[in-house]
């Protein structure tokens, strides 16, 4: 019989611990009531042309029974409940691989208890290969493989090529046993076995109901962690649940513990969360913005002199004038301007012209402090304090009271990160005020436009210059012989 197939099955201990077991038990109680001889769903044999369809009932019979026996008023709710039970394989349509319930005359059949999901089946791919191979041996229209099943069979045949002979022999043996059964019994068992695999190897696009929710599994494996309330309170209804053993009484939380919990939840509320779509958009925009600066994707301009024999890069470095790409990059963000030495210099010149350079000078001094040897740190901390933060400092900066008080305490024990809070506050001020003014300033715009014009003029004259340089490097110049023509002598002198 079909029940004799040795599909993979878990032990009883694992079955009892399955998080889906409560749902299975409730569904099976309803199925047992459906199969009751007196008050259950009437099961009948239907004649169809020259054949008979044994042990079936219609989808409308299920919906009506659920409304009547489970006190369900809405037919849509009854249809939804029936669809969930069908998706778990407790009953199935006899002519469709999609396990769903329709409120019409579609014929359904109950699954045998041997194939119920409460038995915690874990069939392997070899079992599925034997089943599909057996289907191909039986010359029946109702047993023909669907498209996705044929693709699965071909994939399994490639995967188990070495032991396919054994799989074929096992399928052949099962097919011989099936032929010895009664015709009606064989028809019922074939449909039940097909429904079993429709649950465990569903049609593409359908949900696999046998998958275990990782959250439920974690709660079942660690019941003590999940039963404990965040606020130290015990739920009476949950504590009397048959699936949760009573836990020992815990002491009520102290005031300090409650304060810690409140602080923790406040931090969680303040956390900045982004949707995956927003993160993807941000990553795409960042990639598009920095595309021209990635030499793996686009050739750099100017090119690498070690690869192209073009000395434009060295000439620009010697002139200490930033390129157009370099100036344009300062506008991406304040970090880009501060990372570039020329960008820092231009930013500082602009702030000095507005008599507000103390913030940037303080930020640069703190960055320099982090790189100093440890023996120079205390003296350098005092110098920064006297210049920017002490009362009557020549270049006083504007700090909020909280940052100033914390920095005052840190100065008593000087270290490389004494001014960390003050530096962060100044950075935010520059990012929101000084940096936008620098980008909008005429100094930056003139520098950017000047680089664009110089870049265009360089493009117009570099073609001949490169040609002349290449000719001068590649063609040897020999002294002109006294008998050479004037034209050749003039050309030689020109080179």
Swiss-Prot record:
Domain G protein gamma: 255-316
Topological category with respect to the lipid bilayer: Peripheral membrane protein
GO biological process, one term: positive regulation of GTPase activity
Annotated ranges, domain RGS: 333-448
Residues covered by the DEP domain: 37-112
MF-aspect GO terms: G-protein alpha-subunit binding; G-protein beta-subunit binding; GTPase activator activity; GTPase activity
Effect caused by changing residue 306 to F: Diminishes interaction with GNB5
InterPro entries, sorted: DEP_dom, G-protein_gamma-like_dom, GGL_sf, RGS, RGS6/7/9/11, RGS6/7/9/11_DHEX_sf, RGS_DHEX, RGS_sf
Disordered: annotated segments: 235-256
Modified residues annotated as Phosphoserine in this record: 229, 241, 434
Superkingdom to which the source organism belongs: Eukaryota
Subcellular location: Cytoplasm, Cytosol; Cytoplasm; Cell membrane; Membrane
GO cellular component: cell tip; cytoplasm; cytosol; dendrite terminus; glutamatergic synapse; neuron projection; nucleus; plasma membrane
Modified sites of kind Phosphothreonine: 243
Signal peptide coordinates: none
UniProt KW keywords: Cell membrane, Cytoplasm, GTPase activation, Lipoprotein, Membrane, Palmitate, Phosphoprotein, Signal transduction inhibitor, Ubl conjugation
Subunit structure: Interacts with GNB5, forming the RGS7-GNB5 complex. Interacts with GPR158; promotes the GTPase activator activity of the RGS7-GNB5 complex in absence of glycine, in contrast GTPase activator activity of the RGS7-GNB5 complex is inhibited in presence of glycine. Interacts with GPR179. Interacts with PKD1; this prevents rapid proteasomal degradation. Interacts with RGS7BP, leading to regulate the subcellular location of the heterodimer formed with GNB5. Interacts (phosphorylated form) with 14-3-3 protein YWHAQ. Interacts with SNAPIN. Interacts with GNAI1. Interacts with GNAO1, GNAI3 and GNAZ.
Protein name as it appears in the record: Regulator of G-protein signaling 7
């Amino acid at each position: 019989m079909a029940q004799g197939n040795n599909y993979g099955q878990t032990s009883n201990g694992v079955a009892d611990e399955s998080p889906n077991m409560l749902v299975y038990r409730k569904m099976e109680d309803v199925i047992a009531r459906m199969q009751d001889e007196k008050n259950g769903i009437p099961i009948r044999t239907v004649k169809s042309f020259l054949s008979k369809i044994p042990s079936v009932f219609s989808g409308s019979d299920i919906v009506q029974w659920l409304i009547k026996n489970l006190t369900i008023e809405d037919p849509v709710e009854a249809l939804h409940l029936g669809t969930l039970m069908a998706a778990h394989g407790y009953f199935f349509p006899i002519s469709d691989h999609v396990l769903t319930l329709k409120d019409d005359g579609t014929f359904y059949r109950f699954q045998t208890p041997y194939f119920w999901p409460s038995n915690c089946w874990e069939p392997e791919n070899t079992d599925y290969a034997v089943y599909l191979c057996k289907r191909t041996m039986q010359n029946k229209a109702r047993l023909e493989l669907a498209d996705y099943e044929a693709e699965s069979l071909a994939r399994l045949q490639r995967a188990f090529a070495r032991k396919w002979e054994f799989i074929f022999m096992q399928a052949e043996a099962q097919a011989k046993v099936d032929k010895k059964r009664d015709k009606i019994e064989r028809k019922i068992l074939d449909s039940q076995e097909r429904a079993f695999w429709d649950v465990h190897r569903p049609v593409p696009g359908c949900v696999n109901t046998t998958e275990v929710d990782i959250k439920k599994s974690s709660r079942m494996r660690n019941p003590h962690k999940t039963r404990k309330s965040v606020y130290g309170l015990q739920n009476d209804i949950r504590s009397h649940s048959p699936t949760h053993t009573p836990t020992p009484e815990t002491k009520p939380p102290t005031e300090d513990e409650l304060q810690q919990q409140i602080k923790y939840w406040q931090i969680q509320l303040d956390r900045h969360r982004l949707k995956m779509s927003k993160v993807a958009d941000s990553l795409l925009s960042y990639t598009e913005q920095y595309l021209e600066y990635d030499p793996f994707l686009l050739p750099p301009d100017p090119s690498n002199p070690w690869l192209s024999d073009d000395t434009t890069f060295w000439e620009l470095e010697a002139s200490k004038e930033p390129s157009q790409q370099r100036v344009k990059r300062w506008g991406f963000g304040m970090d880009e301007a501060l990372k570039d030495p020329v960008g820092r210099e231009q930013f500082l010149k602009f702030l000095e012209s507005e008599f507000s350079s103390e913030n940037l000078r303080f930020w640069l001094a703190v960055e320099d402090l982090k790189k100093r040897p440890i023996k120079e740190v205390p003296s350098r901390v005092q110098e920064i304090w006297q210049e920017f933060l002490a009362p009557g400092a020549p270049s006083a900066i504007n700090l909020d009271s909280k940052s100033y008080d914390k920095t005052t305490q840190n100065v008593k024990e000087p270290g490389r990160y004494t001014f960390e809070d003050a530096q962060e506050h100044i950075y935010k001020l520059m990012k929101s005020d000084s940096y936008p003014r620098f980008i909008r300033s005429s100094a930056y715009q003139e520098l950017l436009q000047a680089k664009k014009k110089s870049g265009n003029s360089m493009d117009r004259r570099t073609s001949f210059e490169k040609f002349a340089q290449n000719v001068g490097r590649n063609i040897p110049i020999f002294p002109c012989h006294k008998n050479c023509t004037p034209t050749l002598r003039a050309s030689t002198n020109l080179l």
